[in-house]
Regions:
Chain B
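Extracytoplasmic small-molecule ligand-binding "clamshell" domains
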Residues: 26-103, 244
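Ligand-binding clefts/hinges and TM-proximal coupling segments of bilobed small-molecule sensing domains
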Residues: 28-29, 153-170, 207-210, 239-264
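Alpha-to-beta junction loops
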Residues: 39-40, 74-77, 94-102, 144-145, ...
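Short helix-initiation/N-cap motifs at beta->coil->alpha
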Residues: 64, 79-90, 169-179, 215-217
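Extended ligand-binding regions for polar small-molecule ligands
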Residues: 65-73, 139, 144-145, 150-153, ...
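Acidic, polar ligand-binding/catalytic clefts
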Residues: 68, 72, 77-140, 207, ...
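A ligand-binding cleft/hinge motif common to bilobed small-molecule-binding domains
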Residues: 87, 104-112, 157-160, 182, ...
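Periplasmic-binding protein-like
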Residues: 121-129, 197-239, 257-264
Length: 220, 264
């Protein structure tokens, strides 16, 4: 008969709280930087010169066709042999930004390409510069179109940060691992952390759905 | 957790089966070995630096050297039988081997089913680091970073003895822990002697050496219960080898550290 004991696991809450803070911090940093990178890459794939276009698509294909954990290990264990030594947190953010950037690039590009031709012609007839056209006419409605897909991708990256524990980042799943190896209460530890992730993902979705229309793109 | 359960189950079953299946042994192994002019020695073949396959496909290591020494002193041929951690005690009990020389630790459960000689080699959990780093005591660890495998004895020990400013970075398995140290993501490494020796051997560029002891759990040779004549003879050989420095030399050669005080 299995007996549950959540008490000993809950007693370790400072560790869990610490992990939660790091997971949220990693997610916020990589969501902001990764989305910016994604937009830049989407622009580069559509409007950049030939060299820039092929460099961007090489990056996007490399990231989208390799596992996240391998990218993370490459940055943390591989780069030092080239003399680049990053701290655990920086390595995690870099891996998450590069990962989100590649997926966001394709999502944003879909939004940009769906811009009706008439809007571009209208912008041109108003003598807007290419930059004004992109930043004022094309991008905001494109972001509005792809926002739900982008939010899902950000949540996937947040959940993917669980892997960062593998390079000793003390995020949420690492905290759960530590608690389970200290209390020998693995079931309770993982149930608890599952609920925390679930709550976190739902809160993040609500939050981004609220922030998007108000600050990122202004819906009509 | 799972492993713990399985291993305790295995030892429980082994104990139960063996106490039932093997009544008092006849004390005749030493004579049998001398008559046959060969002794069957259970050694590990995949556990450097204790028992492992050398580049020339011959078994080598501290255990293999010690086992060879015993055979030589008995004046018989050494017949090496590769054993694994779960099967070595059953092999001894069923007379497939005469001695276990495979990084065997002594504990009360095992003492119920087999006899132990005196200790012949150290086995230890320790802190390792580059030669350039001066670490003489646990206080010297302050402000440094160290890689350790999560939930191991080393992890627990570090938490107890290390200064709070030591940055303990925990990884999921030995190979990731070692990778973090080898790629110099951490300054130090806390692990078992076997893992560290293999890591240092394969990555000579890091210039790693033994720094501080975390926990000692020396190795003993296992003998079938009741084989007092063989046990006494092996103990004689081991004491002589201890006195003339042979065991010390083996330890220095493979573990990079002296035997220290080995328990009788």
């Amino acid at each position: 008969m299995i007996e549950f004991d959540f008490g000993v696991v809950l007693a370790q809450w400072p560790m869990l709280a610490h992990g939660l803070v790091l997971t949220v911090a990693l997610t916020l940093a990589s969501a902001v930087l990764g989305t910016a990178l994604g937009i830049a890459c989407a622009w580069a794939r559509l409007h950049g010169g030939r060299a820039l276009r092929s460099a961007t698509s090489a990056y996007v294909e490399a990231v989208r066709n390799t596992p996240f954990i391998i990218q993370l290990f490459f940055i943390f264990f591989g780069l030092p042999s080239l003399g680049i030594r990053l701290s655990v947190e920086v390595a995690c953010v870099l891996a998450m930004v590069l990962n989100l950037g590649a997926y966001a690039c394709e999502i944003v590009r879909a939004g940009l390409q769906a811009t009706p031709k008439g809007q571009l012609e209208a912008a041109m007839s108003l003598a807007l510069t290419p930059w004004q056209t992109f930043s004022r006419v094309v991008l905001p409605p494109a972001l509005a179109r792809i926002w739900p897909a982008l939010v899902s991708q950000i949540i996937i990256v947040m959940l993917g940060s669980a892997v960062c524990g593998q390079i000793s980042a003390e995020e949420l799943s690492q905290a759960a691992n530590l608690i389970s190896s200290r209390t020998f209460r693995s079931f309770e530890s993982y149930i608890l952390v599952t609920l925390v992730y679930l709550a976190l993902a739902m809160a993040l979705r609500q939050c981004l759905n609220w922030v998007g229309p108000r600050f990122i793109f202004t819906s009509r | 957790m799972k492993f713990k359960l399985v291993s305790s189950l295995v030892s429980l079953v082994t104990t139960a089966v063996l106490t039932v299946a093997t009544p008092a042994q006849a004390d005749d192994s030493l004579n049998a070995v001398l008559a046959k002019k060969s002794i069957a020695l259970g050694v590990a073949s995949d556990f450097p630096p204790y028992g492992f396959m050398g580049p020339d496909f011959k078994l080598t290591g501290v255990d293999v050297a010690t086992a060879q020494l015993i055979a030589d002193k008995l004046g018989v041929k050494a017949e090496f039988v590769p054993v694994s951690t779960p099967n070595r005690i059953p092999y001894l009990q069923t007379k497939k081997i005469d001695l276990i020389v495979s990084a065997l630790g002594k504990n009360p459960e095992r003492e119920k089913v087999i006899d132990f000689t005196i200790a012949y080699a150290p086995f230890f959990q320790a802190v390792f680091g580059p030669k350039a780093l001066n670490i003489k005591s646990f206080d010297d660890l302050a402000g440094k970073s160290i890689a350790v495998t999560r939930g191991t004895i080393q992890d627990d020990m570090l938490q107890k003895v290390a200064p709070p400013t030591l940055k303990i970075q925990r990884f999921e398995d030995d190979s990731t822990t070692v990778a973090a140290f080898i790629s110099q993501q951490t300054q130090l490494l806390a692990t078992g002697a076997a893992v560290a020796a293999a890591a240092v051997q394969k990555n000579p560029q890091v210039q790693a050496e033994y720094k501080l002891l975390l926990k000692d759990s020396p190795n003993f040779i296992g003998v079938r219960k009741g084989e007092t004549a063989l046990l006494t003879k092996v103990n004689e050989i081991l004491r002589a080898a201890k006195a003339d420095g042979t065991l010390e030399q083996y330890s220095q050669k493979w573990l990079g550290r002296g035997t220290g005080v080995l328990p009788e």
